[in-house]
Structures are given as C-alpha cells and as structure tokens.
Amino acid sequence: EDAWHTRYQDSMRADGLILLGYGDWTTYEARLRELMRQGTHFARWGSVSSESSGATIGSDNLGAGRLVGEHLLDEGRRRIAFIGHADGHYPEFAHRYDGLCEVLRAAGIEPDPALQRDAITTEEAGLSATRDLIASGAGFDAIFAGSDLIAIGALRALAEAGLKVPGDVAVVGFDDI
C-alpha cells in the first residue's frame, strides 16, 4: 500500500499526480514528504502553508473570511455565527473563521464562542449544526458557513424554524457551487 504512488508512476500513465484534500493534508504530510523524496511529481489542492510539501494551490482563506465579515457588517449584521471546524485540523475553515474574527474585533465586536459550531463539509452537518444553534437560543442574525454544502444544510434548518433568509438571517457559503 505504501508504494502505490511508485507503481502508478512506473505505469507511465501520467507524468504526475493532483492530490485533493480538505483539511486532511496534515494527516498525510509525512507521505507527501516521501513522494517528494522519491521524485514523484505532484500538486496539492488545499490550504497554503509554508510548512506544506510540494506545490500547493489554494484560496486565501484568511482574506476571504475578512471579506465575508466586512460584507455582513456592511449589511448591518452584528451576531454572526460560524459553522465549520475552527480548529487547526481543518485549516481552511480555521483561516476563514480567523479572518471573520479579525474583522469583528476591528469593529469592536468580540466574537461569541456560543455562535461557533463545528461541522464537516456536508449538508447534513450544516443542518444539524444550525438546528443546534437555533435550539441554543444564542441569537444570531447571520451565518458564515465554512462551505456551500454546510450553507445548504443551514438554509434547510432556518426554513424548518420559520426564519426568513436574508430577512431574519443572512447566510454566506464558501466554495462557489
């Protein structure tokens, strides 16, 4: 199993690999270093980091989080929830959340931990996290979903609760589906 990439490269079916990941690149960093050591050509889609191995293609997630925060504040939103893992294991989500928090603090608003819910990038996770957020009574007027799939689940939960989008709650997704 550990030599899959060598067998693939030796087959001459491709000149290189494109590796897709969503936060899980940290788990496979040792394998990526091994690919480099063996001379396997690859590019990785994911969070850009100075510690990551190989060529990386990704988004400016921190900057995007700032833009979302600025947009929602410009729209008059002040209680902005974030749905998506904000820990380091999902660096894309964490950077988006960090950008949002920077903008909130610059506007004199301390981010409320009660408005953050962990969710992986699925519709069901967004649905569940938003239901939980609504049930908590924390009170929010916007949701920044870490991905569009999470946002779709959030929209379903808001509709179930009789909340109007964007009237009662603004929703922003990420990924452009």
What residues fall within each predicted segment?
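Alpha-helical recognition/docking segments in bacterial nutrient-uptake
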Residues: E1-E70, D74, A135, G139
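Short beta-strand segments enriched in small/hydrophobic residues
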Residues: G16-I18, R79-A86
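Glycine-centered flexible beta-alpha turn that most often forms the glycine-rich phosphate-binding loop
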Residues: V169
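Short helix-capping segments at alpha-helix termini
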Residues: L104-P111, S136-G139, E160-P166
